[in-house]
């Protein structure tokens, strides 16, 4: 499972590190990142914003109910799902920080104030639910790797960190990716990637390209923490202020050889993977997911990544009454609800569709996203959510094979897709510029097309079918 598929691309040129640096040290910044969290709130034009980090994306029903209550009593009544499987609350009062933190702590959603911003852990959301295993290609009957268990252990290690090489020096943008072997998390281009490779082993690398190391699955979370510590050590030695591994110049990046030495010092055995090539997989498809144990999971996405508290509560009630009492928030702004009787799954999926969830890959809303836009963001040149909704509701569905599409209110393109090709719809002030981006972030096919809002639906539908 670790070989012979294309590796993930470099970042789009418009989303590369924003400040220049020396070739050896990477970007030089005069301040740390400003990523919001549960404690560091962000003042937006529509009120204060909080980001609640969910390592692995998993919420218990009680935790999920709390978030709905917070959205209703403190926020604007909505929950935004992020591209890393976290939840954001908007429209909060500026003085709510203490109350918000207290309520999150009581439900285990803020286990460590000191480490909140570094708890960025994405994990394969269908792990253990659809029968996939990296061993399946060889006919093995071994159980699949439990990347959710990796996420829980990794989060505990991050929150317990108090060593000399303090992991709190990591940026809020540094991402740990835990992939069960299908390549879905690899496509997010994490900074430290763990991927199950079968037979109780895992591949470990910086970014998504080799060389890497093979470690025992039981050692994987500890190895990931040590990889992050190695990144910090290399960054300090180079004099860089890089937030992410890929921001370091190629000659100044951490190496598998030095990481192997660090693992050995910690009592973790590893073997080299000099030609490591990671698979690129796809996100979960909306619909019913059938498991080998006879139960089903429901996979849905939020329209433009945003749910009302009522929609969220419906999912929580289903999970509580008929499912496993857990919800998995995906990095593709969706939810996976596990553990339903197979015969009940179609009815429950229909109920979610009736409430406004995206439940089919045939929907025009599938793989469509947008930044906050006006009125929430002062930098935005348009109310991109309203324009996107009007465009997608026009009836020009592009089908299950359509490219992802993302509306952005300014050149920053906050939250845009990564990995494969996507349609970039950028507000210009008097319309939109529609561009198909390839895997490297460059333009694919014909040049960008500038249209007014009246012609936007047709332009977007045509761009999404680009091959």
Language-model segments: residues:
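Small-residue-enriched alpha-helical segments and adjacent helix-cap loops
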Residues: 2-28, 47-205, 214-218, 222, ...
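Intrinsic, low-complexity N-terminal interaction/targeting segments
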Residues: 28-43
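Short beta-strand/turn micro-motifs at beta-sheet edges
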Residues: 38-41, 284-290, 357-359
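Flexible, glycine/charged-enriched surface loops at secondary-structure junctions
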Residues: 78-81, 164-170, 233-282, 324-331, ...
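Internal alpha/beta scaffold segment
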Residues: 208-239, 251-253
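Short beta-alpha connecting loops at secondary-structure transitions
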Residues: 208-213, 373-376, 439-451
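Active-site cores of enzymes that catalyze phosphoryl transfer or operate on phosphate-rich substrates
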Residues: 278-297
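Short Fe-S-cluster ligation motifs
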Residues: 406-416, 420, 432-466
């Amino acid at each position: 499972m670790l070989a012979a598929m294309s590796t993930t691309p470099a970042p789009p040129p418009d989303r590369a590190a924003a400040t220049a640096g020396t070739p050896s040290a990477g970007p030089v910044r005069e301040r740390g990142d400003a990523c919001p969290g549960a404690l560091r709130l962000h003042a937006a034009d529509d009120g204060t914003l909080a980001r609640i980090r969910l390592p692995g994306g998993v919420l218990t029903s009680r935790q999920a109910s709390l978030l709905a209550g917070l959205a209703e009593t403190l926020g604007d009544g909505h929950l935004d799902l992020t591209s890393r499987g976290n939840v954001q609350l908007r429209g909060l009062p500026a003085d709510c920080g203490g109350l918000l933190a207290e309520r999150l702590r009581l439900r285990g959603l803020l286990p460590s104030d000191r480490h909140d911003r570094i708890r960025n852990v994405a994990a394969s959301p269908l792990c253990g639910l659809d029968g996939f295993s990296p061993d399946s290609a060889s006919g093995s009957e071994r159980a699949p790797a439990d990347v959710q268990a990796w996420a829980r252990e990794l989060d505990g290690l991050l929150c317990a960190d108090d060593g000399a090489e303090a992991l709190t020096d990591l940026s809020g943008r540094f991402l740990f990716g835990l992939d069960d072997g299908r390549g879905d998390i690899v496509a997010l281009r994490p900074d430290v990637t763990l991927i199950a490779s079968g037979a109780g082993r895992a591949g470990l690398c910086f970014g998504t390209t080799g060389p890497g190391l093979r470690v025992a699955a039981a050692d994987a979370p500890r190895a990931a923490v040590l990889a992050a510590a190695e990144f910090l050590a290399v960054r300090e030695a180079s004099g860089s202020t890089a937030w992410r591994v890929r921001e370091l110049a190629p000659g100044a990046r951490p190496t598998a050889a030095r990481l192997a030495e660090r693992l050995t010092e910690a009592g973790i055995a590893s073997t080299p993977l000099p030609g490591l090539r990671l698979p690129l997989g796809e996100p979960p498809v909306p619909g019913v997911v059938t498991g080998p144990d006879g139960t089903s999971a429901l996979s849905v996405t939020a329209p433009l990544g945003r749910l009302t508290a009522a929609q969220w509560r419906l999912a929580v009630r289903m999970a509580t009454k008929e499912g496993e009492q857990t919800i998995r928030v995906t990095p593709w702004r969706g939810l996976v609800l596990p553990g339903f009787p197979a015969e009940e799954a179609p009815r429950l999926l229909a109920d979610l569709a009736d409430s406004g969830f995206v439940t089919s890959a045939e929907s025009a809303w599938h793989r469509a996203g947008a930044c906050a836009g006006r009125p929430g963001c002062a930098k935005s040149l348009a109310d991109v959510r309203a324009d996107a909704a009007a465009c997608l509701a026009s009836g020009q569905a592009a089908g299950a094979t359509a490219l992802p599409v993302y509306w952005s209110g300014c050149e920053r393109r906050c939250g845009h897709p990564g990995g494969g090709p996507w349609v970039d719809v950028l507000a210009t002030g008097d319309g939109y510029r529609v561009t198909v981006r390839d895997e490297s972030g460059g333009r694919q096919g014909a040049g960008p097309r500038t249209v007014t809002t009246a012609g936007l639906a047709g332009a977007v539908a045509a761009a999404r079918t680009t091959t």
